[in-house]
Structure formats: structure tokens, C-alpha cells
Amino acid sequence: MDGIVPDIAVGTKRGSDELFSTCVSNGPFIMSSSASAANGNDSKKFKGDNRSTGVPSRVIHVRKLPSDVTEGEVISLGLPFGKVTNLLMLKGKNQAFIEMSTEEAANTMVNYYTSVAPVLRGQPIYIQFSNHKELKTDSSPNQARAQAALQAVNSVQSGNLALAASAAAVDAGMAMAGQSPVLRIIVENLFYPVTLDVLHQIFSKFGTVLKIITFTKNNQFQALLQYADPVSAQHAKLSLDGQNIYNACCTLRIDFSKLTSLNVKYNNDKSRDYTRPDLPSGDSQPSLDQTMAAAFGAPGIMSASPYAGAGFPPTFAIPQAAGLSVPNVHGALAPLAIPSAAAAAAAAGRIAIPGLAGAGNSVLLVSNLNPERVTPQSLFILFGVYGDVQRVKILFNKKENALVQMADGSQAQLAMSHLNGHKLHGKSVRITLSKHQSVQLPREGQEDQGLTKDYGSSPLHRFKKPGSKNFQNIFPPSATLHLSNIPPSVSEDDLKSLFSSNGGVVKGFKFFQKDRKMALIQMGSVEEAVQALIELHNHDLGENHHLRVSFSKSTI
């Protein structure tokens, strides 16, 4: 039982069996005009969402919310994963329903929070799929507030398409969130350099970053970072506070600043105004105006070196970090795609976000496979998008199950978080960590039928070079594929014909304007794109060119 919600129809009280049959019909969840009863002590039980995570749906059920939680905080749970299209608040029951724009976004969100316990206001909350496929809400006061908050967020997100977001959108977001769009960031245990660019890459995943100033105070590397809106600042703080950038060090402490905007005078390696590319570089040292200095009780000019000072304090114990610091975090954060310098550190074995750099079980159990079509090679290619696959074993007596051994635990987490729930050969695969620590090769003479393969020395490994740029381009499965290593003689029609030859539908194609060795191709569905990647990655295009295929974050 997941608590209490109103009757689905107005004016009639249904028995539990009738209500349950309505819930599992996968119709829309209609929030009736009796919504206020649900926020009081109504006793009608809702039996629809009684599973652990459930069957994927755009609608997500959130339970055990703090009684004083705001609509904005609930919306912020979904923002890192895509657009939130509807919200239903049941405050009296400490519950909510979030509707995402796509099932893929909802699936990524649930996968993430399955690994990383979500925390709001210091309280763990619970997230699972709802039986409902969409939400419909009425105009009761509680739902009106939720819709107003949702509209404010959407207007801000629309404004984010341009760096200079409209003042109205920013004001709407400010009114909803009630805080500054400026974050104060302290990096503790600074054993590796954290540059302005690293901060920009990490924090840009939560919204448009307008300005950053870095400085050193009290022997601590600090930064002020201004978003285009306070909603982005809010969910960046919720998601990143207490996280480690690199393994067991460089811990982020994040608070809201008293400032509402930053005044950046120079664009250099210490400060940057992304809305003003015309600013001079100055002397590579940012200066804070007197208002800012007063806010920090600091002199106008901060220390020239952000890495000065040898004594770094121990990691600050943030309650929220306790909810985030679990072994699965590295993989769970992967849908947010923290790239570039941080990913390069991952390739060098330093990334931690938090506490997992090569540690943990590297063997995955993959189930619900199509036994008629799955092969070790297809699993090697697909899982190889997220790490270097060492061995694959399809179980001899249960061919719908397989073991996939990655190079380390972080790669296993990455593959699991991105691929769990996606369709392969017409079936939604399920991926969990295996109890096995390695995949055993068959003994000599043991019947295997080619179901176990060793790929330890495969030339197709994408991440074998330390610091490989491929770590910067890891994305969830999508309908759009990134193609590279295309020879000059191969045309758009050639590639379209190649990708449609296996029954897929090509919906769009575009060569890169500056480099015709690369292109984007859009398939008819995510499942078609997955199949095309498996079949055509490393395809021989002639002229000693083998096609490279990966998932893209872009669309055509």
C-alpha cells in the first residue's frame, strides 16, 4: 500500500477491487475536484503503485515527502533527466506524482534514484513508476499552486535557450524558488586541480551557467557561480552538494549566496562571463567588487592562486551527502553526463562521484534477453559503448540470461544505469550486479556452443587509452547516432541505404559542417538505433575505414 489518494471519479465511492482495476487499466490519473479530501484525512486507499520500481511509465510516484516540501523541490527531482510536464501534489499524504515528457527520461530518473537514495530537506524519499500513463489535474487550490510552479519552471527553461533569459522568466523562477540564482561553492580536500572549466562542465548539466568567479579564501578553493535562474541553482545544489569530483577528494560544499548577481570584469582562467565574450582577459586574476567583498567579509582582491595553502580540512559531513554516498553513485550520475575534464579523470582512474573509481563488482547479470537473437558479440558491442567489455557468457541452460564482465566496477555501473530497461531484440532487458566476481571461461572439452567469449584483448575497446576522449561522449541510448571515420567517397545516400538495409527507418541525416568524416543519423526509434549500432559499429566502409557508431545527445 502506498498511501491515500482521492477517488478517481467525482461523487462515487468505489470498493477497493473496483479502484484497483481502474488503476491498472493504464489510463490517465484524473485528479478530481475532491482533491482537498486527499490532502486531509480521507481514508480511501490507493492500491495501484504497490511495486518496488514497477513497469516503466512517464508518471513517477514519490512517497514519504517532508510535510513542508515545496512544489519547486519536487519538480527539481525530475529536472536533471528531462522536462517535467505535469505535477500532482498530495501534501496531506506526503506524496506526489511527477509526469516526465518521455518514458526514457522517467526510466533514467528511476534508475538513478534506485542507486542514489533521494533526499529532500534531510529526509530520504521513495520513488517508483506509477501504473498511470499520464496525469490530468483539476483546478483546486493545491493543484493550481503546483501548476503555477510548473509553468514558472518551464518558462525559465524556455528562457535558458538563450543566455540572456527573459526577466519575466527569471522573476517567475525566483518567486517560486525564493532564493538566489548564485551558488557559493567550496571545494574541500583539493588534491587535484579544479579549474573554472571543470566547474562549468559539471554545473552546466543543471541549467545555463552565466558567470563564474573562482578565488581562494582561508586556504580553500571557492567559487561563485550564477545560473540564469534560481530553479537551476536549486536542483544543482540538491544533486551535487556533498559529491566528490575525484576519487576520495575534491568534495563540493554548496550553499546559496547572498548575492543575486555577479559582476565579472575579466574573462580568464579565474573568472568568466559567458554572456560577455568581449571582456578583456585582464591579469588572470579576478577582482570582486566591494559589494561582493562585503558579502564574504573578504578584501577586494582574493589570493592569486586557487591552490595556495597546504592544509586542507577533512571532508565536511553533510546530511544529504549520506544519501548520495553509496557505491552506485558513479553509474547513477552517468545519465547526467558529466564530461570532459572530469571524465578524463575517470579514464585515469581518479573520478569518484563519489567513492567509486574501479572499485566494486564489475560483472553484470543481464536478463530478459531474446534467446533466439542475442549473441555474445551483440552484447559486447552494446555494453562496449559504456566501458571495455572483458568477457561475455550467455547461460547455456537459460539463454535469456547472460553475464557481462566490464573492466571495472565504475564501467559496470555506467552500463547498468544507461541500458537497464531499454529494448534489445524486442525485449526490455533487466540489468543488475552479479554475485560473481568474474566470468569463467569453459574448461577444455566442456560443451559451450560458443556462448562464452573472451574480449580482453579486443581492438574494439573504446576506452583502452588513458584519458581517452571517448569518456567525454558517453550518452544514454537515443534515436540519434553519431557516426565517425567516414571516408570521403561515402555519400549521404550510401549511409542512409546502409542503415535502412536491416529494416530500420532513417528519419534524418546530417554531415558535420566542418568535418565530413562525422555525421548524425536519426533512426525511427531508440530500439532501432540500438540495433543499428550493434550491427554497424566497425562496419567496413572501404579505403581502410571502419565506421564508428555511438549514441548522440543531439537531435537533427
Curated annotation (Swiss-Prot):
GO term, biological process aspect, one: regulation of cell differentiation
Quaternary structure and interacting proteins, as annotated: Monomer. Part of a ternary complex containing KHSRP, PTBP1, PTBP2 and HNRPH1. Interacts with RAVER1 and SFPQ.
Domain RRM: 58-142, 183-259, 362-436, 479-554
Annotated positions of the Phosphotyrosine modification: 126
Modified residues (N-acetylmethionine): 1
Keyword terms, alphabetized: Acetylation, Activator, Isopeptide bond, mRNA processing, mRNA splicing, Nucleus, Phosphoprotein, Repeat, Repressor, RNA-binding, Ubl conjugation
CDD domains on file: RRM1_PTBP1, RRM2_PTBP1_like, RRM3_PTBP1
Residue numbers of Phosphothreonine PTMs: 137
InterPro entries: HnRNP-L/PTB, Nucleotide-bd_a/b_plait_sf, PTBP1-like_RRM2, PTBP1_RRM1, PTBP1_RRM3, RBD_domain_sf, RRM_dom
Gene assigned in the entry: Ptbp1
Region (Disordered): 35-54, 436-458
UniProt entry tagged with the keyword Repeat: yes
Name of protein: Polypyrimidine tract-binding protein 1
Pfam families reported in the protein's UniProt record: RRM_1 (PF00076), RRM_5 (PF13893), RRM_8 (PF11835)
PTM-bearing positions, type Phosphoserine: 16, 140, 458
Cross-link (Glycyl lysine isopeptide (Lys-Gly) (interchain with G-Cter in SUMO2)): 64, 217
GO cellular component, one term: nucleus
Domain of life: Eukaryota
